[in-house]
Amino acid sequence: MIFVVFNQNFTLLNPQKSHSMKKIYFLLLLSALTFQSAVAQNELQNPYAVAKEDGFSYRSLKKLINMDSLYVGSQFERPYHDLMSILYSRVGHYKDAMRMAEKGNLFSDKTRLARTYENVITIPLSEVMDSIIENNRVIMLNEMHFNPHSRAFVISWLEKCYQNGYRYFAADTLFAKDSLVNERRTMLIGETGFYSDEPVFGDLLRTALNIGYTLVPYEADGWGVDRERNEADNLIKNILDKDPEAKFLVYGGMGHISDRKGWSMMGGFFKEKTGIDPFTMDCSVMTFSEQYESMDSLRTVFFDRIDAMPVREPIICYDTAKRIYPNNSGMDATCCLPRTRFIEDNIPDWKLYNGKMLYTINRRFIKKNGFPEGCVSAFLKSEGEQCVPIDQYMYGKDEKEFKLGLYKGEYLLRFDDGKAYKHATITVK
């Protein structure tokens, strides 16, 4: 802390010197405040370090919301928006997550794609899905880490791929330190993986385990090319060295799955080292975003076409030469997911998969069991609150009720106001 002390009687100084002395005092004060601001910038922690203190939980989000003015305009502004988009998605605030992602310029590639999708032919994914699964032994799909839409979509691939001999599900979220996940068959918060603490991702892994997949970590330390190369090496070591004829799914973030020669991404290194040409499909750029769903070029080419289909479903994009489009993206195909429709303000339609249903939490229930505002997490009673919840939601004091997306079964609800926990049990029938 910097203090500048003024002489309380400085106005009584020699009048000829008074004006110049005031200027000196002002300059001293300005310099002190500037220096103090610089010190504060240097003392400001990386937002990921701040969030880690509370396990990247609701409490982390609440703390960082109150620090918004410190991070905006600082050297940590972009990672702040990046992390906030992830944390908002974990508590069911998907619109806020998208807005934070847009502030962090994480959608820049989508603008470029919108300008190039002028002569695109689209067909339902269901017409080619069987062929993709049957004619490949390695399929790589991707996501944007703040958007669970792709995770819900990938769940729909698991059963059909398993029926065609795929036995491993590799994901970059998984930590190698959780070596017992395949035996335990549950996802531990903060232990199994980072992104998988989000309910839909947790359910993706839970579903894969229930079907019979073996979960495989492949994340690597480091940055840039070394990280990409090491990720490919980990896939080889953790799967192919043990099962040379294996068929498997790989789920990664954004461009890491690209297998285009010369791009130095994980998918390309894997192809080069193994001779296996994986089928790589971008499932990230054409997913939910308020800003980009309103763009005329995207709406006309994709979302309106899907809305006009008898059954709204994902579509695959081809160019006028009937090649899977985009053929210059470094991936084999782009998949466009249907326009998001919110059933309730906090429940997107893609969240009700695998027989999930809406369960209402009203103010009367909250008053009896929880806090006026906070976050509620719904854990399977058979798993307990150390595991990733089936759903969770951050609610405000003015919300009369809200919905959770839950399966039939018994649940442990945990209410958190940022300082304490309260618990209740429910049965969804």
Residue ranges and their predicted role:
Residues 41-429:
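Compositional signal for N-terminal targeting/processing segments
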Residues 1-46:
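Bacterial Sec-dependent N-terminal signal peptides
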